[in-house]
A protein has these predicted regions:
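Bacterial signal peptide processing site
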Residues: 22-24
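TPR/TPR-like (Sel1-like) alpha-helical repeat modules
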Residues: 78-88, 137-138, 162-186
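C-terminal motif of bacterial Sec signal peptides marking the signal peptidase cleavage site
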Residues: 17-20
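Helix-turn-helix repeat elements of alpha-solenoid scaffolds
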Residues: 31-46, 77-96, 126-141
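"A position-specific structural signal for the A-helix of alpha-solenoid helical repeats
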Residues: 28, 62, 66-69, 111-118, ...
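C-terminal soluble interaction/assembly domains
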Residues: 300-334
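Boundary/linker segments of alpha-helical solenoid repeat arrays
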Residues: 55-57, 86-95, 144-152, 181-204
Length: 334
């Protein structure tokens, strides 16, 4: 399993020094470092800066994304675990507001799902089949708990199917694929995974998801993190006459050209299953808005409007499978 990140970068004039505390808004130095100078500069800033206690969970998610991009998967898993433990504690103290005017950062729905998805991807990259399948359980449980029918987490679900297949849990893999072959969705890769899972359920026990030893059917599966995700800005939510609360909204970036290609390869590329981060972010926040209006969920209400978010989130997450030529064991994605 390979993971590739392609950022749309802007060349700056010199690297600014990151002093004091790291901030996590749309125009923060962290976002600037990550998208203009890459993961190494971002990691250095995160490890050298003083992080305010209410931002520790978010800082560890940012660190996890950077470490994954650098191929340091075990360290990324450690950062994700630290973030999860902090979020559990912060959820109990969300009403507490610090002297800076913020309470502890709590993730939006899609950020919760994608944190668990990142853990699953790291374990797959480490070839920990049992651990990846257990992480798939947690990711799908999170999707079910959120209950957002409009949130298309196809990337997470296909990745979960691959993880289950690798662990020999073929029926669970088929369950993860439910609905992914609907009309209008890219089905070639999903169909290929489904056929292999069905073969496993029927009693053919391949090693993970490996196909029969036919030389012309050698694939590499890659995870692509493409572009720059939406940013969050302060807003208000109208709850009725004379009653508004502090809220936020997701704003898309300027139109981006998000593309990739396989270098020097004429072999077919299986269609990708993907998640559009802006779509799931907007759909998830709209669901939370409806729940707050209905009284089913309590909003956090800090003194200041809150635009903190996971700034290194990509615009699109994709899974692709590339058929390898017989003389090669790798391909270059650009």
């Amino acid at each position: 399993m390979e993971m590739v990140r392609r950022r749309l970068t802007v060349v700056g004039v010199g690297l600014v020094a990151c002093l004091g505390c790291v901030s996590f808004g749309p125009n923060s130095i962290l976002s600037y470092l990550y998208y203009d100078y890459g993961p190494e500069a971002t990691l250095e800033a995160l490890e050298s800066a003083e992080i305010n206690p209410e931002n520790l969970a978010l800082a560890n998610l940012e660190k996890a994304m950077v470490l994954t991009e650098l191929g340091r998967y075990e360290e990324s898993l450690d950062a994700l675990e630290t973030a999860a433990l902090r979020l559990d504690a912060d959820a109990e103290t969300a009403a507490v507001v610090s002297s800076r005017g913020y309470g502890p950062w709590l993730p939006e729905y899609h950020e919760r799902v994608l944190a668990k998805t990142l853990a699953m991807a790291n374990l797959m990259a480490l070839y920990d089949t049992v651990g990846a399948a257990a992480a798939a359980d947690l990711a799908l449980e999170e999707i079910a708990a959120i209950g957002c029918g409009e949130c298309e987490f196809g990337f997470t679900r296909l990745l979960a199917a691959l993880a289950y297949g690798g662990a020999g849990r073929f029926s669970d893999g088929l369950g993860a694929l439910e609905g992914l072959e609907a009309e209008g969705r890219p089905a070639a890769l999903v169909g290929e995974v489904r056929r292999r899972l069905e073969r496993g359920v029927a009693g053919f026990q391949p090693e993970g998801l490996a196909p029969p030893p036919v030389e012309s059917e050698r694939f590499v599966v890659a995870i692509l993190l493409l572009g720059r995700g939406p940013y969050k800005e302060p807003a208000t939510l109208d709850l009725g006459p004379g009653h508004t609360i502090r809220w936020s909204r997701w704003v898309p970036r300027e139109p981006q050209t998000i593309a990739w290609a396989v270098m020097d390869l004429d072999e077919p590329v299986r269609s990708a299953e993907f998640t559009d981060v802006e779509e799931v972010a907007v759909a998830g926040l709209d669901l939370r808005r409806r729940r707050v209006i209905a009284g089913d969920e309590s909003p956090s209400s800090p003194k200041k409007r809150d635009a903190r978010h996971w700034t290194s989130m990509p615009a699109s997450l994709q899974v692709v499978a590339v058929e390898l030529p017989s003389e090669s064991d790798a391909v270059d994605l650009v």
